[in-house]
Every structure is written in structure tokens, then in C-alpha cells.
């Protein structure tokens, strides 16, 4: 006799692709992290929409199978230090090479596939565990970080997961009692049969989405656009702010971001100008910091707003402005939840502003880091976006 298994109870039991899809997602996540420096520092994606697609290489997965050796004296055993996905016995079975960028090789390579992901998907893999540090509850909260769903009454139509079982039973009992009263009023003594559930008994929870408000936050993005910031430095600075702005907009709703560029004079610019306009001239770091504080004074009262400052420069400041810059940074720290200062390619550490800020700005909400190449972008940003600053 044939036996048919009912998969309607748990339709995922026979879906053999679930594990494959999970493994594929893990491979995509690993590939994004391994190629992060190249992805986020690719200048062509700066300022692009979140739906723009980029390609990343993913190492292929092979089915398990037995492989015949080449009759060598060695065996294809591991050394004990292998990791998941490594090919065992590869080095022992020959001295061939794959030929990766340095001449032709004679060994079989790995299967590498390219998959397309959107910019939004890239950052969704990476930004889940990051938060604005020291985010305080302020008056007149406006930031919506999530939408909480709350039950708000009942309705006659809905989806099965929202079926209100208790309310449905009550409606059925009410219908039964109404029928009994009607029969009694008619003077009939007929035995009342048990009524089954009907569509008119069904009641579903009405769900109302309620915005979950937390705190106000204003982000000051300040970038040094002086003549000493060559194309490489500006490219790294823009990449840093591109990742930062994507994080802010994906993690928080209605957050305010101000973009400030400066040489000897600081001014607020549009986001497009910030990422694409080229400037020159000397460097007064204090001008950028003072412009940020002027904007805060005009639009963002620290009593009701969480203030964050992110400043990127090569640290090459005009000497007469050093003292003013240190003074401005101290003032900024007094009103801000956190200030992150990233210095790009310091050619002489003892003469740059990072060295001076580290020595004269002792506030706990001040974080300084160095960006020497594109591989440093992600670690520096992670350092600044810890949830709570250490005491």
C-alpha cells in the first residue's frame, strides 16, 4: 500500500534547498566582508542610489566526491590546521601554482562565481550591530528607529496567523445563544444541535503600526577640502563619509545630517557638492569645527538633540590655527555625544593634528583614528560606531 506523507503541516521539511540558500547567504556575507575594502572604496558607487548593483566574487561549492591521486608517495591528509572549505592534501600532491597575477601557473584553480548585490544589501550585512554611541533620551524625541505593531481591536477579515481564537469562540457562543433564545420564543422544544463554526464567527486581530520613537540626533560631517588633500586623500575621505551616511540612513529615520567642507573658510554644502565638488586653498581646521558649532547653535539645541561630529582631514593645518583648532575641538566635545576624528595618510605623525588633539583633547567622547589605505576605512568606522563609549 502506498503511503503519502502530508507536508502541509510543515512544508519546509522536504525543501532541500533551504540549507543551500542559507549556505549561499553565508558565502555572500563572507565575500562582502573579504572584499569590503574594494567595495566601499570604489569611487564610482559614491553618491549612487541604494539600488545600484555591484559584483562580488564568490567561491564555488563542490559536491562531495572521491578524488584519485596521482600515484605519488605522499597521501592527501591534512596537517591539523585546516579550515572549513580548504582543499586537503593540495600542497603535498605537487608543487604546481595557480598563477595568480604573477605569471602563468600549471595547477587547477578554484571555481569563482560573480554575484550581483545592491549597495543596500551590502550595508545591511555589515551594519546590523553598529549604533550611534551614547544615544540619550532627549526631550521632543523625533527619531523613528522601528515601527512596533500593536493589537488594536478585532475585525472580520484577516490572515490566519492573526486569527483571534478566543474572540472567535465567543462569537460562536453568542450565535448559539441567540439561536436558543429564538427557538424558546417560538415555543419549540426541539433539541438544539451543536453548531459548527462558520465564517461569520471568525475574528482577527486588527494590527496598528505605532512608530517607535527614541531620540533626536544631528550628525555633523566635516571634511577638509584644502589643497593638501590630494585626489587619493579626498577619495578616502569621501569613501568614509559615504559609508557613514549609508549607515545613518539605514539605521535611523528622520535623522538630520549636515555636510560641511572647508579650506580656510568653512561652509555648509549640499550632499552632492560634498561628495563631488573639488576645492583648494589653505587649511584652517578651526573653520570647519566652528561652522559645525554655528549650525548646531542655530538649528540643533543640545538640550533636545544628540550631537555627533565626524571630521576627516590629512592633519596638515596652518601653524597659526593649531591653538584655535584645539580650542574649538574642546568646545565641540562639550556639546557633543561623540566626536570622531579620522586622519588620512599622516606623513609625519608628530607634526599632524591627530598628535596634538590626542595630547590636548582629553575628553572621553573624543575618538581619533588613522586611515592609511582603503583597508582601514571599515575598522576605523567600527571603532567610532560602538554602542557605548568606554568610561
From Swiss-Prot:
Bias type Gly residues, positions: 96-106
Any matching Pfam family: DUF444
Superkingdom field: Bacteria
Annotated InterPro entries: Spore_YhbH, UPF0229, vWFA_dom_sf
Region (Disordered): 1-20, 75-109
Family: Belongs to the UPF0229 family.
PANTHER family: UPF0229 PROTEIN YEAH
Name the UniProt record assigns to this protein: UPF0229 protein CA_C0580
Organism of origin: Clostridium acetobutylicum (strain ATCC 824 / DSM 792 / JCM 1419 / IAM 19013 / LMG 5710 / NBRC 13948 / NRRL B-527 / VKM B-1787 / 2291 / W)
